[in-house]
């Protein structure tokens, strides 16, 4: 039996999670769902979009399934996704992209996995209103996070028999921040066990 946090979210979130729960149940997987709510709908009841009880549930169960969650646009509330990433140190975002069998597509033999650092850069969500006509976002890149995501990406490539790793940056424009990330990634590329 598995204890899993289920964050139902809001908007289309509950509809999606209900369907996923039915599919998992039909597959015969024995799960005890720890149902939690987060998002815009929760603000009215609890004053925040991501109550501490949700984070505690994920930490306790060590696994969660989260549906779409709305964060109100404007001042006052941090994105639920950004909060979860920070609180749980969810630094690596994997996005696989590949062709499905028997489905015709414009491009054949697509098999790409994008690995994105999830806690820094503009995803840190550090912003301020300079004046009524200007807003500012801060792009933070640190050596520690850059080394950690590069290590993760290259280890993933080795473990999954990937032949190539492409490092994507805007180092031509953001010479210091993306330049730091690029330099640290190139160190990992030069290791003999790397693709």
PLM features: what roles do these ranges have?
Residues 116, 121-169:
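Internal alpha/beta core interface subdomains
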